[in-house]
Amino acid sequence: MSTALNARRPAPAPPATKAAPAAPAPKGLLPVVLTATFMTALDIFVVNVALPSLQADLGAGPAAVQWVMAGFSLALAAGLVTAGRLGDRYGRRRVFALGLALFTLASAGCGFAPSAGTLVGARVVQGLAAALMGPQVLAILRTAFSGAAQARAFARYGLTMGVGAVFGQLIGGLLIRADLLGLGWRSCFLINLPIGLAALVMVRRCLPESRSPQRPGLDPVGVLLVSTALTALVLPLIQGPRLGWPLWTVLCLGASLALLAAFAVHQHRSTPTDTAPTGSTPTGTTGPATGTTGATGATGTTAGATGAATGTPLVDTRLFRDRAFSAGVLAQLAFWLGQGSFFLVLALHLQFGRGLDALGAGLVFTAIGLGYLITSNTTHRVTARLGVRRTITVGGLLMAAGLALLALAAYEVSDGSVWWLAPGLFVDGLGMGLVIAPVTAVVLAGVEPRLAGSAAGVVSTVQQVGGALGIALIGLLYYGAGDPTAAFGHSVLALAVLELVLVALVRLLPRTS
């Protein structure tokens, strides 16, 4: 067995062609990229509690309110894969800074929007800006850190994502209740201005430039196919539940599958046929000084290939030959199928099922936050002791147990107190803290630095598509139940099953992950 596994691994690269060990990352690098991560996570989830206020203030109808959420998600999902390639080609710091500046500007547009239409347009720009930043953050963490430092960096990334997601609800509730300067819901967007401007000042000082030495092409056919496919996939998933799944949503879903298949075929044909997608750099890949390809000079085509490529693929399909990458992507999909819908279902249950205001709902979310902070801050040490597979397994089982406790509280507790939900939320938070960082790090840990942007784009896209798909599927269950209490109970039970699916998929990861 060991011999067979070793035979599938690429031979180590000669010392001259290995990527040189990265210099110690500047001290301010991690805070800068994690600030952008926090801003994005906060902006996604703070809107959950701001919707009723902005709807009343702008006189927005249900369709406009839906597009405040949908416009951001659609632009984000459609742009992630392409943004990963832009970072590889033009420089991750440059693309990250562009995304950060655009996100800050769009936040001002949201905060000062005079109408629902203007707000939706600004949210679309926010989504595009978040798409520019997301893959660069993951690629920078992959290329700037190694070994134990990389594990700690991804643990901080997971901590930041969770804090933004969990406490975003509370921060939004506090801002709306405080009504600073009479801004109300607008402060939920305007809070990004000082944070974004401070981060922009730090980018030049703390963030070194990095890019693929091969300056890969943009693959315009691939960009068109994947952007159209993801738009056709995510749009009906967002609009379908509200509209009752009219014919056009079904046709869009069918078209998205066909377009994704065409994209996969195009990427496979464009990918060189050498067998070293991850781990070490294949022989002749990168000249140590010039960054040109060893076999083809400066053409930008991957070197060392034994077969001709028809172009530069947007996603190098050799990535999926690596078991850790492909199994990790599946685990990511299962995780975000559940988490993408859980926060929305809980917010709906608290505000419409239990009648809480934005601040009250945000306070309930602190139970998840406390559990999450306890485990996510020590995930790298737990992973070092247990390994990735066992850590994610323990986390998935804790999440399933927490969700089962929530279902029990929904079905059996009749006094109406929301604090009966606290034990289940706390246990779910403990599990979530053990999953987010390892399930992200395991996908990217073995990826070559030259492919970091492309791989990060895939991971970020899976997160967004998984979340949209989860919202659509769990939304059918939630809105189909009728009674709010039963709807919540049925939904969290289904989510518990999804966490068990995650635990099963983790078994596909290599034992040495």
PLM regions: where:
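Transmembrane-helix bundle of Major Facilitator Superfamily
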Residues: S2-P12, A19-L200, T378-T379, A404-A407, ...
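12-transmembrane solute porter fold
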Residues: P26-V49, D274, G307-S513
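Helix-loop interface residues and adjacent transmembrane-helix termini in multi-pass membrane transporters
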Residues: G59, R89, F112-A113, A144-G147, ...
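A residue-level signal for alpha-helical anchor/packing sites in multi-pass solute transporters
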Residues: I140, L174, M202, A232-L235, ...
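Interfacial helix-cap and linker-helix signal at transmembrane-aqueous boundaries
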Residues: L54-Q55, L86-G87, I171-L180, L237, ...
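Transmembrane-helix exit segments and adjacent C-terminal regions of multi-pass membrane proteins
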Residues: S2-L29, G244-P246, G284, G291-G300, ...
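Hydrophobic transmembrane-helix bundles of small-molecule transporters
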Residues: A178-Q332, G338, L356, V364, ...
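Alpha-helical transmembrane segments of multi-pass secondary-active solute transporters
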Residues: V65-Q66, V95, A153, S187-I191, ...
